[in-house]
Amino acid sequence: MELKKIMESYSQCGQDIFVYNILNKNNGTFLDLGCYLPKNINNTYLLELNGWSGISLDIIDYSEEWKERKNKFIQQDCMNVNLDELLDSNYDNKVIDYLSLDMEVLGDRFKLLEKIMETSYEFKVITIEHDSYLSEDYVNVEKLPQRKLLKEKGYILVCGDVSQKQYPTLFYEDWWVNSKYFNEEDIKTWFSDKLSCDTIFNKLNINYNVNAISEKW
């Protein structure tokens, strides 16, 4: 696959660059759970600029800040939302291009991931935090259960234990793809383990603006 080059990231770790390049499409769809602010440290703003659509949820009310975004923000505790109702009322297709999942309470990410996997929806790319650098509890309660579940559901871990450029040994996130929607040769080229995002992008020959990313961390 000829990867498309994206210059600027608004994500904490270049997740938006990764997603846009491997899917290589405009007008995709996303679901952002634990979305935080509308632009800085946001995984879907770059995608929106390229025609993507979707919904973003956060327990904190950022509705005033999100008025500048085209896509819908919902102030909601993701742990208590009716996912089937939420997804059915906002998506026409059962296949969503991108899921971004970032909850703050230990154990919540895996619990929410379980609920998502019980719905009739699936995703082409998933980025999910596990924060395993914080303690062994995060390894046992988040990272390992997340990996077991997603592998059982047919997802492939292409970038495990991703870290930020500034903190290359603080591994906090995994990047997954759905094996149904990518060919085996492409998937092989994306594999990495315990690498910082800038190293991953260099390996994939993706050009990007380092300052644009680092200024937002």
Model-derived regions, located:
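Conserved amphipathic alpha-helix within the SDR
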Residues: E85-Y91
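Conserved acidic-Pro-Pro-aromatic motif
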Residues: T44-S53, W66, N71, D92-W217
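Juxtamembrane luminal stem/stalk of type II transmembrane Golgi/ER carbohydrate-processing enzymes
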Residues: M1-M7, A212
